[in-house]
């Protein structure tokens, strides 16, 4: 079976990860002790993708949990599904990274990384045919960003041909936790561009907006945000965990979504949006799902797809529905909004149908888009980075851990290159190339 190894790092990564496992366990009928109590064969058919079956018939998540301080992990362990994880797979230090990327990547994190890699190796050896890794982390702090990217590059070295998927929470302008977020995020993106295959971009600001506007929650807590993230993650991974009419795996996802290797940062959306307590009481139709899913307000990252163009997109529909209707709806969206899709990639929207809906819903859909408008987000972080870096503010925290200013300059220009690559493809039209070729012809003649 094609297994996926899940790794979560830092405070944010561990909280999102814990939530993700709660959702996945519920969908597969697995209780908090790891025993199966579900009612459908389909729940077990591809359970090996995320779980290892222990000798006593219990299912243990293929998960590695790491952090540089014990706090968050203790709360995961004492949480609702804390007892389901393998105890040896909790790897933590005592010092903390203090929101410092350099501590996570070079000093504190580097001391802990070997014990994390040992656990990763052990889990990978337990797999029949490992298809890839998924990493949950945030880019604003120290551990998830610094140590997370260190781990990704080490795994890259050791398993060069396996797919690396990340769920990365970007810092957002309104919800700031630390003043050095732009530094940490830029240094991380520099790593992710090189070492990750696919990055699902999540963003606290967009999540707040959804909670506030759509779900009418006046004071959204991190629990509410994580509920949304876990719904999205469950949707992105559902066709890997359940049989369906149009299946896909991490590699197929990448092949359909990434036209150029560096442009692998995806916007994700989810429909129908529900708050934690209230699942919707009316059944949705495929057209309604489609309409909601493409809506800019449903995107969980703070970039507006209407400001750019889609290079590629992919939709995962869940529930009992006709594939024909799904295809018609997707074609309909493309025809009506053709200006928002680049015309030089025909048929650039793919859809997948998975038969099992999320808990409490009859139908749902998840959207994954590779849109040039995501440059807004990089641009925003880059501006904040430059403002501080120009004055060398807070830099001593990083140089004190042995970093060089040169690294900052490199990361900054890499981020700006990424933005201009997105811009270049946004402006490109199908006819550009033809003219250039004709000119060459004439020149030769």
UniProtKB/Swiss-Prot annotation:
Its main location: cytoplasm. Residues 423-445 are annotated as: Disordered. It comes from the Eukaryota. The keyword GTP-binding applies. GO terms for molecular function: GTP binding; GTPase activity; metal ion binding; structural constituent of cytoskeleton. One of its GO terms (biological process) is mitotic cell cycle. It is found in: Cytoplasm, Cytoskeleton. GO terms for cellular component: cytoplasm; microtubule. The keyword Glycosyltransferase does not apply. Tubulin is the major constituent of microtubules, a cylinder consisting of laterally associated linear protofilaments composed of alpha- and beta-tubulin heterodimers. Microtubules grow by the addition of GTP-tubulin dimers to the microtubule end, where a stabilizing cap forms. Below the cap, tubulin dimers are in GDP-bound state, owing to GTPase activity of alpha-tubulin. Dimer of alpha and beta chains. A typical microtubule is a hollow water-filled tube with an outer diameter of 25 nm and an inner diameter of 15 nM. Alpha-beta heterodimers associate head-to-tail to form protofilaments running lengthwise along the microtubule wall with the beta-tubulin subunit facing the microtubule plus end conferring a structural polarity. Microtubules usually have 13 protofilaments but different protofilament numbers can be found in some organisms and specialized cells. This is Tubulin beta-9 chain. It comes from Gossypium hirsutum.
């Amino acid at each position: 079976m094609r297994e996926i190894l899940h790794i979560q790092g830092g405070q944010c990564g561990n909280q999102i990860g814990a939530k993700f496992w709660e959702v996945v366990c519920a969908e597969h009928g697995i209780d908090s002790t790891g025993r199966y109590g579900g009612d459908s064969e389909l729940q077990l058919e591809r359970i090996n993708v995320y779980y290892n079956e222990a000798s006593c018939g219990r299912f243990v998540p293929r998960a590695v949990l790491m952090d540089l301080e014990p706090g968050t992990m203790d709360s995961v362990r004492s949480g609702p599904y804390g007892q389901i994880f393998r105890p040896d797979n909790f790897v933590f230090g005592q010092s903390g990274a203090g929101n410092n990327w350099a501590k996570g990547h070079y000093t504190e994190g580097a001391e802990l990384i070997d014990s994390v890699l040992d656990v990763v190796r052990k889990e990978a050896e337990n797999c029949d045919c490992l298809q890839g890794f998924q990493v949950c982390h945030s880019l604003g702090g120290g551990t998830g960003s610094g140590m997370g990217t260190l781990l990704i590059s080490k795994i890259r070295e050791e398993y060069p041909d396996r797919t690396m998927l990340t769920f990365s929470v970007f810092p957002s302008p309104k919800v700031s936790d630390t003043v050095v977020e732009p530094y940490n995020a830029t240094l991380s993106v520099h790593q992710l561009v090189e070492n990750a295959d696919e990055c699902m971009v999540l963003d606290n600001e967009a999540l707040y907006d959804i909670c506030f506007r759509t779900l009418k929650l006046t004071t959204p807590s991190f629990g509410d945000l994580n509920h949304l993230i876990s719904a999205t993650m469950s949707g992105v991974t559902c066709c890997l965990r359940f049989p369906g009419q149009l299946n896909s795996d991490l590699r197929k996802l990448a092949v359909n979504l990434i036209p150029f290797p560096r442009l692998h940062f995806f916007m994700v959306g989810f429909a129908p949006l529900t708050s934690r307590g209230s699942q919707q009481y009316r059944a949705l139709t495929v057209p309604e799902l489609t309409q909601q899913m493409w809506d800019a307000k449903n995107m969980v990252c703070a970039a507006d797809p209407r400001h750019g163009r889609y290079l590629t997109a992919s939709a995962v529909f869940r529930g009992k529905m006709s594939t024909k209707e799904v295809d018609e709806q997707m074609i309909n969206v493309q025809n009506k909004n053709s200006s928002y899709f680049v015309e030089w990639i025909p048929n650039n929207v793919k859809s997948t149908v998975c038969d099992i809906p999320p808990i409490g819903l009859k139908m749902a859909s998840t959207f994954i888009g590779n849109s040039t408008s995501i440059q807004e987000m990089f641009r925003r972080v880059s501006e904040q980075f430059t403002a501080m870096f120009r004055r060398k503010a807070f830099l001593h925290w990083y140089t004190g851990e042995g970093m060089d200013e040169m690294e900052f300059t490199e990361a900054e220009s890499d981020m700006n290159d990424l933005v201009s690559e997105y811009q270049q493809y946004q402006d490109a039209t199908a006819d550009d190339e033809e003219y250039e070729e004709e000119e060459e012809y004439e020149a030769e003649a």
